[in-house]
């Protein structure tokens, strides 16, 4: 695929809201979300093609395609796989924290169904600056949700206070140290992984 890691942060405006976008793996590096929030993003769009993939993480792995093909007859078995550690349970370990810690709205999208030789579990959702899910796609098929973003939540959320309480003089030299990125993700080639 012609997919490469991003090399800059982007904040743009939509109808008065400052928005950022971090694609898939970029969201796994917590500093990316913080940097985008510090650039003024109120909403961060997070398009993904993730979950239900091979991984050394306990409980991770592929979904048996038979479960997807049989979803009309046995939705419960598929839902258990989709919501377990291969999918939603893993997502809930980190995604709400990105919204909460940075006091931003998060618009997370992920496909459902066949993606080449893998089955994806969807779980597209919108989270508020408190890290609470305000809308989520739960159908075992195509779905979409909408939500109303409330500007006041941006400053009411704990993450807003914590961002303002930061003391970069304590850790700027630590966080800013030179570091060679080693991104070990399946879809990157060896050439790209070593950049």
Regions found by a protein language model. Name each.
Residues 2-3, 89:
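Short gly/ser/thr-rich secondary-structure transition/capping motifs
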Residues 4, 8-39, 46-48, 154-195:
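Cysteine/selenocysteine-centered motifs that mediate thiol-based redox chemistry or coordinate metal-sulfur cofactors
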Residues 18, 27-144:
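CN hydrolase (nitrilase-like) catalytic-core segments centered on the catalytic cysteine
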Residues 58-59, 63-67, 120-121, 128, ...:
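Charge-rich, low-complexity amphipathic helices
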């Amino acid at each position: 695929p012609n997919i490469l890691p991003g090399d800059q942060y982007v904040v743009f405006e939509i109808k008065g809201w400052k928005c950022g976008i971090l694609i898939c793996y970029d969201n796994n590096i917590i500093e990316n979300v913080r940097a985008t929030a510090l650039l003024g993003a109120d909403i961060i769009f997070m398009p993904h093609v993730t979950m239900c993939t091979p991984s050394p993480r306990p409980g991770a792995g592929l979904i048996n395609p038979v479960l997807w093909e049989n979803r009309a007859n046995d939705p419960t078995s598929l839902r258990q796989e989709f919501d377990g550690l291969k999918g939603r349970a893993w997502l809930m370990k980190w995604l709400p924290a990105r919204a909460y810690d940075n006091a931003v709205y998060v618009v997370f999208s992920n496909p459902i169904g066949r993606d080449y030789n893998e089955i994806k579990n969807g779980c597209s959702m919108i989270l508020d600056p408190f890290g609470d899910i305000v809308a989520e796609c739960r159908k075992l098929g195509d779905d979409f949700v909408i939500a109303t973003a409330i500007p006041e939540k941006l400053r009411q959320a704990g993450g807003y206070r914590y961002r303002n309480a930061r003391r970069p003089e304590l850790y700027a030299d630590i966080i800013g140290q030179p570091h060679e990125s080693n991104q070990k993700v399946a879809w990157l080639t060896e050439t790209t992984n070593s950049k």
